[in-house]
A protein has these predicted regions:
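Alpha-helical recognition segments enriched in aromatics with Gly/Pro capping
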Residues: 1-169
Length: 169
């Protein structure tokens, strides 16, 4: 496809380098986190067991997001979003220009919150460009192939290019 990756980073190494702690310090220093209670999510019929609880929240609504966002789960571990903020701070510190995210269409609801995070972490100095890709279903013998990074069931892009050609991709 003509795209070269020159930096590979793992979430674990970014957290180990202290970027989550840096995020929390930036947010605290700028009074952008607080202990609060989120409203019950709308449109979720299966949330009968949902209970309001105090949690650490990022004031993402100040930056155009629909609501403030939780940084910790009920079990005390960090949310995916908190770790993603650490990753974006890492990218902010590495770049001299704008950031580009390429996300699947299943992440559309995530765009505003991560844009808010980049604005807050960069003091509005870095622009985040989000590109969204369609979800593609691969078929084998008229059956949809279910892929998952977490389960280890996936097809490498290089294999698809070898089988189909890069123009199809």
């Amino acid at each position: 496809l003509g795209v070269e990756m020159d930096i590979f980073s793992s979430e674990k190494s970014i957290i180990e380098k202290g970027f989550l702690n840096k995020v929390l310090k930036i947010l605290k220093d700028n009074k952008l986190i607080y202990e609060g209670i989120l409203e019950k999510p709308k449109g979720k019929a299966d949330l009968d067991e949902w209970e309001p609880r105090p949690q650490l929240l990022f004031k993402s609504s100040l930056f155009g997001d629909d609501s403030d966002r939780a940084l910790k789960k009920s079990d005390g571990s960090w949310t995916y979003f908190a770790n993603d903020m650490a990753y974006h701070l890492y990218k902010i510190e590495k770049t001299k220009g704008n950031l580009i995210n390429i996300l699947g269409a299943d992440h559309l609801g995530y765009l505003k919150r991560i844009e808010s995070a980049v604005k807050a972490l960069s003091s509005n100095k870095i622009k985040l460009v989000n590109k969204v890709c369609a979800i593609v279903h691969l078929m084998n013998d008229d059956k949809k192939i279910k892929m998952s990074k977490r389960s280890g069931n996936f097809i490498m892009l290089s294999d698809l290019i070898n089988d189909l050609g890069k123009d199809v991709i």
